Amino acid sequence: MKNIPEVKLGIVAVSRDCFPMSLSESRRIKVCQEYKKAYGDIYECPTVVENENDMLKALDEVNTADCNALVVYLGNFGPESSETLLAKKFGGPVMFVAAAEEPCGDALIDNRGDAYCGMLNASYNLALRNIKAYIPEYPVGTPDECAKMISEFVPVARAILGLKDLKIISFGPRPQDFLACNAPIRQLYNMGIEIEENSELDLFESFNAHAGDERISAVVADMEAELGKGNKMAGILPRLAQYELTLLDWAEAHKGSRKYLSLIHISEPTRRTPI
C-alpha cells in the first residue's frame, strides 16, 4: 500500500499586460532551470497568464499534465485577478512566488518587472477571495532563491494532498459509525479528513480469523531480518505478524473513497485487548 502522496509540481508564469510578457517567460525559464538542476522535475506551463482566457488555458494545461500542486510565478507585476482565480480554480495546493529585479543595463523599460509590488497585490487579493495559498516568508528572489523556495513548498503540498485524501481508522469501545458518542472531531472534518471508528472486538475477531494465514511466515522472516541481533523475543513474532496482516487487510478493506490511511487505537484504562 502506497500511503504517501506523490507531488507533481507545475509552474505558471503570470504577466501584467502593461509589462513585457517575454520578461515573465524568460524569468520562469531560469527558475525552472535552477529547480531541475538542484531539486527535481517541474512541469513548465507554456501559457503565460495575462487575462482570464489565458488562465483557463493554463489551467487546462496543468490539469492535462496531471499536476497536483501549482506554483504561480510573478515574473513581473502580474494580473492580480487572473492569477488568484487560477489558484481558486486549480483546487490543489498553490504557492505564490515572485522575481527579484535584476541588473537592467541599458534596457530599463524591458527588464523591470515590479514583481515585488505585484506580490503585495496578489496577497491582498487572495485574502479578499478567501483563498489559502502558500506564500514564503520572503517570497521574492533570484532564480536560484525561488527554486529553493519552491523546493520548500513540496512537503507542504504533500501534507495538504495527504490530508485531503486521509482516513483515520480507529479502534475503541464503540462500533462503526457511532460518532454521536465520540470526542470532538469537527476540526478534522474541517481539514477534509474522514474518520471511521471500529470496535476493538471486531478487530480481535479479525485477528483470530487470520490465524494460520499462509503469509505469516514471510512476515516473520522480514521481521527477523530487520531485528537482526536485536531479536530477543522470537516467540512473539508470529503473533505480531498475524496482527500486522490483520491491520493491513483491514486498511485495504476499509479505505473506501480515500487514498491514505492512519490507524490508531483508542486507549481506555479499564479495557485490555487480548491480542
What are these language model-derived features?
Residues 2-121, 129-131, 135-158, 165-169, ...:
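Metallocofactor- and cofactor-centric catalytic cores in central/energy metabolism, strongly enriched
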Residues 264-275:
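Single conserved hydrophobic/aromatic residue that forms the stacking wall/gate
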Residues 126:
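Peri-functional-center coupling elements
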